[in-house]
């Protein structure tokens, strides 16, 4: 009724509409990837498409079926009929990571019978009693994972305290707007030409008092709004001072200049620069839940072994779902896997 009243038609409605009234499509071949994640409705769509396909190719891994909470039943994939090709060689996981993955997989009761081999490199498993003992995270590229969004907050706090540049599903730990403002000031200090669009972003973080002439900050905003092409207009340091009211000496540090920048965030940005983090490039650390990182991989992976109470109860009852989740987690690592002991009574044990 809610959708009907507002004339909403979502993705689920599209699938239902195709199943009920969609035309049969003659196909030479149908390809389905990640088939272990198909829910009941998507399986019905698959069956309808498959009826009119000469050949069907289905790829998936039941050990990575971690979306039962959204209506996915791994049994459908496990019981699928057809000629099976088992891809036996991993080009990601080193030996030590393969070993721990197999230990978890052995706990899964309902599964297809299959084996796969690791890369020839040995790799490394490191266990830490506490997150702050993981000193290796100071260098290199990392995936850091927690079982839930709430648990992942520990990882973001850790990275901010350490001065590490990271990304989450919500974006980079320093926004593009803030980086543009910083880069603009650094360019001004070097005497380079600056676009008015960049200058406007810089002025956003500067309180006018004693730093920008009265009214010039708002004048710049209006000028750009009324003249869209003005965004690309390039101006010199002298022009910025004479026409756009910059009052401070260009030798002033960005830290002192950015008076409209939250102090805690300034301290974090300062620590990034002091550590030599490449803040103008791609963050070297990605923080995500295990479910959110499915499909990802990295040379180095750090995994918090904490669990929420609901997940822990499922784990203690011996349900396969939770073992599959942790199997997915450890197999994100190519070379090094760092396991951090839980700091609560609810943790997964390997």
Regions found by a protein language model. Give the residues of each.
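Accessory N-terminal region flanking or inserted into the helicase ATPase core
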Residues: 1-31, 40-45, 58, 68
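Conserved helicase motor core of SF1/SF2 NTP-dependent helicases
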Residues: 29, 36-122, 139, 143-158, ...
């Amino acid at each position: 009724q809610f959708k009907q009243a507002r004339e909403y038609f979502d993705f689920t409605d599209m699938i239902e509409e195709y199943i009920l009234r969609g035309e049969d499509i003659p196909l030479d071949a149908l390809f389905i990837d990640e088939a272990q994640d198909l829910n009941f409705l998507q399986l019905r769509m698959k069956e309808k498409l498959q009826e009119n396909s000469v050949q069907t190719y289905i790829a998936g891994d039941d050990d990575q079926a971690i979306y039962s909470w959204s209506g996915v039943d791994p049994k459908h994939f496990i019981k699928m009929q057809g000629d099976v090709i088992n891809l036996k060689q991993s080009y990601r996981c080193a030996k030590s990571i393969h070993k721990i993955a197999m230990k978890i997989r052995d706990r899964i009761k309902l599964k297809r019978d299959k084996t796969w081999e690791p890369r020839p490199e040995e790799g490394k498993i490191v266990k830490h009693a506490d997150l702050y003992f993981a000193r290796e995270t100071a260098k290199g590229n990392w995936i850091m994972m927690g079982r839930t969004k709430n648990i992942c907050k520990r990882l973001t706090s850790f990275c901010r305290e350490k001065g590490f540049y990271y990304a989450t599903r919500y974006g980079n730990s320093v926004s593009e707007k803030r980086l543009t403002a910083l880069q603009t000031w650094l360019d001004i200090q070097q005497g380079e030409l600056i676009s008015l669009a960049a200058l406007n972003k810089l002025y956003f973080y500067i309180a006018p008092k004693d730093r920008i002439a009265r009214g010039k900050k708002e004048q710049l905003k209006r000028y750009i709004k009324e003249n869209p092409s003005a965004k690309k207009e390039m101006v010199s340091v002298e022009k910025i001072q004479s026409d756009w009211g910059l009052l401070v000496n260009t030798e002033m540090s960005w830290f002192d200049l950015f008076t409209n920048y939250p102090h805690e965030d300034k301290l974090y940005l300062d620590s990034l620069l002091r550590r030599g983090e490449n803040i103008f490039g791609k963050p070297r650390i990605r923080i995500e839940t295990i479910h959110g990182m499915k499909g990802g991989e990295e040379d180095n992976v750090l995994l918090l072994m904490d669990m929420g109470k609901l997940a822990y109860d499922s784990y203690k009852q011996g349900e396969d779902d939770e073992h599959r989740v942790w199997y997915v987690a450890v197999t994100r690592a190519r070379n090094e896997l760092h396991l951090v002991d839980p700091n609560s009574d609810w943790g997964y044990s390997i």
